[in-house]
Amino acid sequence: MRLVFAGTPEPALPALRRLLDSPRHEMIAVLTRPDAASGRRGKPEPSPVAREALDRGIPVLRPARPNSPEFVAELAQLAPDCCAVVAYGALLRDELLAVPPHGWINLHFSLLPAWRGAAPVQAAIAAGDIITGASTFRIEPALDSGPIYGVVTEAIRPTDTAGELLARLAVSGAELLSATLDGIADSTLTPRPQPAEGVSIAPKITVEQARVRWDLPAPVVERRIRAVTPNPGAWTVISDLRIKLGPVRLGAASDLPAPPEPLPPGAIHVDRKSVWVGTGSDPVRLGQIQPPGKKFMNAVDWARGARLDPAARAT
């Protein structure tokens, strides 16, 4: 089939590369979000998908308004048979969806109808799910609600961050998307409607929502931190400094003894080998932390240099 690939960030690259290397399909263009400011100077940079396409000599489409009549007409001129989508980053309206005869086939990183929305991997980790996966489905106007072509499952490891889990799903999902498009081309796949039961929503996580709530139970705190690692990144405030946090360890999973006395939520205990913070249940041990303007470092090394007030709290 003649394909247009729509995607923007790094996790879309395995699928793009898999389809570019497929002898079954012809990639006629790549659709991605406009260049965005990056780095300290704020210089506009092409998306990871745009860079890959340009390196491969594939035309790149970067409309600011993909649903505009002008772009709908431009896409129609290309006459794609199908459009494959992985984390494009914009909602698509009926006029655009109607252009390719085989529709727009999306790779979504959850087992639909669970975790529809922009942050399915983060939501699955935060919820304590032990199994997740990826689904291919035909895009309809309602959010992630179209009929499903195929799924692949993936176990969530106890220490998985969102970045680590997403990297695995991007690879297994690339194979699923390729197989789905092959089946559509061969007329051997029939999509099935999503069940009405089991629907859950995973909206984008804001920076403010990534602030750690130390009043929650320790297992919830630990999962939530992994769920926003590396983006947008967990953070807290200690001694008026905004500190980014890497994954933490639960007391039961730590190889070091917990503080001798219970810690109220947000209270900090520093000993020779560890930094502990109280939660709504048991304390957690900090691992890597990032003070303002510095790189990630061991929490103990930072605490020694910072000379924390004994009354300092994480808030």
UniProtKB/Swiss-Prot annotation:
CDD domains reported for this sequence: FMT_core_Met-tRNA-FMT_N, Met_tRNA_FMT_C
InterPro entries, alphabetized: Fmt, Formyl_trans_C, Formyl_transf_N, Formyl_transf_N_sf, Formyl_transferase-like_C_sf, Met-tRNA-FMT_C, Met-tRNA-FMT_N
EC number in record: 2.1.2.9
Gene Ontology molecular function: methionyl-tRNA formyltransferase activity
Assigned keywords, A-Z: Protein biosynthesis, Transferase
Pfam family, one: Formyl_trans_C
Binding-site positions, (6S)-5,6,7,8-tetrahydrofolate: 110-113
GO CC term (a single one): cytosol
Catalytically driven reaction(s): L-methionyl-tRNA(fMet) + (6R)-10-formyltetrahydrofolate = N-formyl-L-methionyl-tRNA(fMet) + (6S)-5,6,7,8-tetrahydrofolate + H(+)
SUPFAM superfamilies: FMT C-terminal domain-like (SSF50486), Formyltransferase (SSF53328)
Function description: Attaches a formyl group to the free amino group of methionyl-tRNA(fMet). The formyl group appears to play a dual role in the initiator identity of N-formylmethionyl-tRNA by promoting its recognition by IF2 and preventing the misappropriation of this tRNA by the elongation apparatus.
PANTHER family found in the cross-reference section: METHIONYL-TRNA FORMYLTRANSFERASE, METHIONYL-TRNA FORMYLTRANSFERASE, MITOCHONDRIAL
HAMAP family according to UniProt: Formyl_trans
Family: Belongs to the Fmt family.
Protein name (record): Methionyl-tRNA formyltransferase
